[in-house]
Regions:
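A short SAM/SAH-binding and catalytic strip from SAM-dependent methyltransferases
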Residues: 132-148
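A short glycine-rich, Lys/Arg-flanked "PGG" loop and its adjoining helix->strand segment in the class I
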Residues: 148-163
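Conserved class I S-adenosyl-L-methionine
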Residues: 163-202
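Short alpha-helix
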Residues: 215-238
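Class I SAM-dependent methyltransferase SAM/SAH-binding core
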Residues: 62-123
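A short acidic, Gly/Pro-enriched loop at the edge of an enzyme's catalytic core
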Residues: 120, 124-134
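N-terminal, positively charged/glycine-rich alpha-helical extensions of SAM-dependent methyltransferases
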Residues: 1-38
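Conserved alpha-helix/loop element of class I SAM-dependent methyltransferases that forms part
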Residues: 33-62, 76
Length: 279
């Protein structure tokens, strides 16, 4: 069972705690059924239908994936026609796993490159100055204390005429009870660092783990949109979706490959997605 402690300040070792937690979980994710890398090698695409519809045709375009983990989404865009993809993650084991996956599929670094770096240092770490598409999300932003700095970094990497695409779990869900998602039990506007101590991983809750401390932050929808606008990007759309990728609430059912509320339950947004263009 997880425990949470909120703090008004940023714990000095937040990055080290989070990196140790993610580093330890990479082998579990590589070997487990959740990411199903053998299945990925066969089907070569794990992107969600709303993402591919909203991003559109990527043929011949360059794409940077911030906080890419083990690279399955990154490589899916390559398989959909991107000319070159670059994935960035702060976990060295995750990047090594992504490189191995790419190499096993026959992709050299000229087509699929993976870089180890903190996302705030991405502009100095990635091989190109800018990309046609900067892609991120689905569990990425909660690990970052400064959303404005993230937006400035991401915007700086979007090529003129290009865009940032973000799909992320809706922050409203973090204000609701875990059982049914029907009651407001947490402050939507809470700002402090949230410190968790939780063994296992979303991919395997029973996996034995040692590095279980992590630090997260909640960013409201207004925070994210405003940060991107302040960074000079033009918001082209903001969409909300009534599906999730995991059983966020205990009463969820699986339908059409997504987790969602059962029939008759009032719906709320579970994921949001946005496109923000430069120029």
């Amino acid at each position: 069972m997880s425990t949470e402690r909120s703090s008004v300040s940023v714990p000095s070792n937040w990055r080290e705690d989070n990196r140790a937690m993610w580093d330890e979980r990479v082998p579990v994710h590589v070997a487990g059924e959740f990411y199903d890398l053998d299945g990925f090698r066969a089907r070569r695409d794990v992107l969600r239908d709303f993402e591919t519809a909203e991003v559109g045709d990527v043929t011949g375009r360059t794409l940077l994936h911030l906080q890419c983990h083990i690279g399955t989404d990154t490589l899916s865009w390559l398989h959909r026609g991107a000319a070159r993809v670059v994935g960035l993650d702060f976990s060295a084991p995750a990047v090594e796993a992504a490189r191995a996956l790419a190499a096993g599929l026959g992709h050299g670094p000229e087509r699929a490159a993976f870089v180890t770096s903190d996302v705030y240092d991405a502009a100095e770490a990635v091989p190109e100055a800018s990309y046609d598409i900067v892609y991120t999300g689905l569990g990425a932003l909660c690990w970052l204390p400064d959303i404005r700095r993230w937006a400035e970094t991401a915007a700086s990497l979007v090529a003129p005429g290009g865009f940032l695409y973000l799909a992320e779990f809706h922050p409203l869900t973090e204000a609701l009870d875990d059982a049914t998602g029907s009651r407001i039990v947490h402050d939507y506007f809470r700002r402090g660092a949230q410190v968790w101590d939780e063994p296992g991983t979303y991919a395997d809750p029973d996996a034995p783990t040692v590095h279980n401390r992590s630090v997260e932050w909640q960013h409201t929808l207004g925070d994210v949109v405003s940060a991107l606008a302040a960074a000079g990007l033009r918001i082209e759309f903001l969409h909300e979706h009534d599906v999730s990728l995991f059983p966020r609430f205990e009463n969820f059912v699986v339908q059409d490959g997504y987790h969602r509320f059962p029939a008759g339950h009032p719906r709320i947004p579970l994921i949001y997605s946005l496109k923000a263009a430069k120029g």
